[in-house]
Amino acid sequence: IFYQTSALASACHHSGIKISDGYLKATPPKAPVSAGYLTIHNNGSADINLTGARAAFAGMGAVHDMQMSNGVMTMTEVENGIMVSAGKIVSLAPGGLHLMFMGLNQQLKTGDEHTITLTFDKCGDLDVSLPVASNAMSGHNQSSHKNY
């Protein structure tokens, strides 16, 4: 399955940030939350920090992490953001770091595409358009890579 992650606008245009393998998790009707997954490539010469996310379809977005603690999977907000060192790659994937969208105002349907805004501490906001995929699909088999 092939999905395209496309740039819409960006204050990070010349910073060397590349987003790939992005998708949003499909939801049933009236679901209050969904998750977003993607890979951040920092091809620039400075470290960057992903500090937040937002989308028109959600009341709020945040960066979260899932970790196993005493045999129980827990999810917590990553309050200081996710550091992506210069020349490095960080993946946000199921079962680990991910974007959490809460207070959904619409169903996210498989095949649709939505714009989300990623906020980075050093280069501001980056808008990306992500496809919605069913729970059984993985965006990490995608071959499309976009430079922003």
Task: Please place each PLM-identified region on the residue numbering.
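Compact, glycine-rich, soluble single-domain proteins
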Residues: 10-148
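N-terminal signal peptide c-region/cleavage motif recognized by signal peptidases
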Residues: 4-6
